[in-house]
Amino acid sequence: MANLCKRVVDLEKYIVKEAPPTVYYIPDFISEAEEEFLLQQVYRAPKPKWTQLSGRRLQNWGGLPNPKGMLAEKLPDWLLEYTEKISALGAFAGKTANHVLVNEYKPGEGIMPHEDGPLYHPTVTTITVGSHTLLDFYRPVCQAEPDAPQTEESRYMLSLLVQRKSLLILQDDMYKCYLHGIRGVCEDVLSEHVVNISSTGAQVGDTLPRSTRVSLTIRHVPKIIRANLFLGKK
């Protein structure tokens, strides 16, 4: 664990310069053995830990974010190892990640374009295991120009190829100003709009079949409520 946290990565080496500020993409952030370990831990979780949504299912670890404050719950050791590892990179400006959302996407499943919102420190970090995905980015609907085309296609900006074992970090404009989503398809055809393709070993025109992907979205929730305060104890 100590050796893990001592690992220092110069994030600037991994910045995706073709994207607006700021995207860091680190291929092979974890090993094959770590990937297998994480998958085992995810699927060992008790059935009530899963929440089924349209197009995916998820596990929530660390508490339920709320505008009034998140009632903090201790993360399990298998997640603490990775929240500490990512926090040690400086991803959260010296703060420590305290929340993990585990999402499972089967082939053909996805999520509509959305933003993560103000409940979190304005950084989102994601470890991907099991399969790749293509993460698409969109400009928000423009209220000032109601007559302008507002379709997803017209607002589409770019994509990121997010591979197995990678770490993706989104900050600044890419977190605050744009929406991100995953199309519900069974395979991805890589186009010139995949701006991190040079970091992936893939090529424009490649067709990548999806299998089941598990993502660990690791974030810092600034506003928390300690359990003893919630229960009225001193």
From Swiss-Prot:
Binds 1 Fe(2+) ion per subunit. It comes from the Eukaryota. SUPFAM superfamilies: Clavaminate synthase-like (SSF51197). GO terms for molecular function: dioxygenase activity; metal ion binding. Fe cation binds at H114, D116, H180. One of its GO terms (cellular component) is nucleus. InterPro entries: AlkB-like, AlkB-like_sf, ALKBH6, Oxoglu/Fe-dep_dioxygenase_dom. It is found in: Cytoplasm; Nucleus. Residues 96-222 form the Fe2OG dioxygenase domain. 2-oxoglutarate binds at N103, Y105, R213, S215. Keywords: Cytoplasm, Dioxygenase, Iron, Metal-binding, Nucleus, Oxidoreductase. Its cofactor is Fe(2+). Its EC number is 1.14.11.-. Probable Fe(2+)/2-oxoglutarate-dependent dioxygenase involved in oxidative demethylation of nucleic acids. Binds nucleic acids with a preference for ssDNA or ssRNA to other types of DNAs. May play a role in nucleic acid damage repair. Belongs to the alkB family. This is Probable RNA/DNA demethylase ALKBH6. It comes from Danio rerio (Zebrafish). The gene is alkbh6.
